[in-house]
Design a protein with these regions (language model features):
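N-terminal cationic amphipathic segment used for targeting or macromolecule association
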Residues: 1-2, 68
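An N-terminal, well-structured beta->alpha segment
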Residues: 2, 10-50
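Cationic, low-complexity basic patches in intrinsically disordered or flexible, solvent-exposed regions
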Residues: 7
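Glycine-rich phosphate-binding loops that contact phosphosugars or nucleotide phosphates
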Residues: 48, 52-110
Length: 110
């Protein structure tokens, strides 16, 4: 590939990366604006003071994110696992106790 084309492709890739980062920054800023500090503090305190595990659930892309959150929590010492909502009623609900905290993730709100 000629050097000029390679340089042009690198510039295009760089611009694409910058646009992606800018988009992520805007999304995080919007998230920050929408947070209710009191509710967030209560939720974090509830999770921290729980004697059980953190159970994450979600369908589709929310489920993929939930799996990552559960894995990250578990790898940092917080007992956690993911329960797929479509399979929960087929035996997985039996793993959840009254002491556990369940976090349901949904983009649609359903």
């Amino acid at each position: 590939m000629p050097a000029a084309i390679q340089q042009s492709q690198m510039e295009s890739d760089k611009l694409s990366a910058i646009k992606t980062i800018d988009s992520e920054i805007r999304a995080i800023e919007e998230l920050k604006k929408s947070l209710d500090a009191e509710s967030l503090t209560k939720a974090l305190d509830f999770m921290q003071n729980s004697t059980g595990r953190i159970i994450i659930t979600g369908m589709g892309k929310s489920g993929h994110i939930g799996k990552k959150i559960a894995a990250s929590l578990a790898s940092t010492g917080t007992p956690s696992f993911f329960v797929h909502p479509a399979e929960a009623s087929h035996g997985d609900l039996g793993m959840i106790t009254d002491d556990d905290v369940v976090i349901a993730i949904s983009n649609s709100g359903e």
